[in-house]
């Protein structure tokens, strides 16, 4: 388990509560999604949970999300099609793909289908928060 750097920790403390960082969590298991979302919301992120690729695409039509967190089965062709569609809909969003095996082959598949980074399942909420904070530093340098 990695520890967030001091810079990232200070960024979380300074995060403005009226300006949440919107993220979309695509997780078919709503119990897991609710648990992860509560940890992210406690850290100051605005999380929208969607249980299917279709509902996630619909949500993207209504709002812009700085980050897309996708729980994916890379062996499922429909999942890869969904990753492509999510990337086309939000080319500037940062896409984090969580999969059971995050090896070099999985990273290559994820990058080919529009993902920016790969994390292993089960998701470590602290690691995910550190990654989102690091992205937020790059996305909003005026903070």
Where do the model's predicted regions map?
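A short, hydrophobic beta-strand element within the central beta-sheet of small alpha/beta folds
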Residues: 92-104
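Conserved phosphotransfer cores of two-component systems
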Residues: 61-63, 85-92, 113
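Non-catalytic signal-transmission and effector/linker regions of two-component phosphorelay proteins
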Residues: 1-39, 43, 66, 88, ...
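Acidic, metal-coordinating helix/loop segments flanking the phosphotransfer/catalytic sites
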Residues: 49-67
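Alpha4 helix (beta4-alpha4-beta5 surface) of REC/receiver domains from two-component response regulators
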Residues: 81, 101-118
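Conserved phosphotransfer microenvironments
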Residues: 33, 66-88, 99
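Negatively charged, flexible loop motifs adjacent to catalytic sites
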Residues: 52-55, 75, 101-105
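A Lys-centered signature of the CheY-like receiver
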Residues: 121
């Amino acid at each position: 388990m990695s520890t967030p750097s001091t810079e990232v920790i200070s960024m979380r403390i300074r995060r403005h509560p009226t300006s949440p960082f919107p993220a979309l969590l695509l997780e078919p298991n709503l119990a897991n999604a609710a648990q992860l979302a509560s940890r992210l919301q406690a850290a100051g992120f605005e999380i929208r949970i969607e249980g299917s690729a279709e509902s996630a695409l619909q949500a993207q039509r209504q709002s812009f999300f700085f980050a897309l967190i996708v729980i994916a089965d890379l062996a499922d062709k429909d999942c890869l099609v969904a990753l492509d569609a999510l990337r086309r809909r939000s080319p500037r969003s940062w896409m984090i793909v969580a999969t059971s095996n995050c090896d070099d082959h999985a990273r290559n598949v994820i990058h080919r289908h529009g993902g920016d980074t790969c994390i292993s399942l089960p998701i470590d909420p602290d690691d995910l928060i550190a990654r989102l904070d690091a992205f937020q530093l790059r996305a909003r340098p005026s903070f």
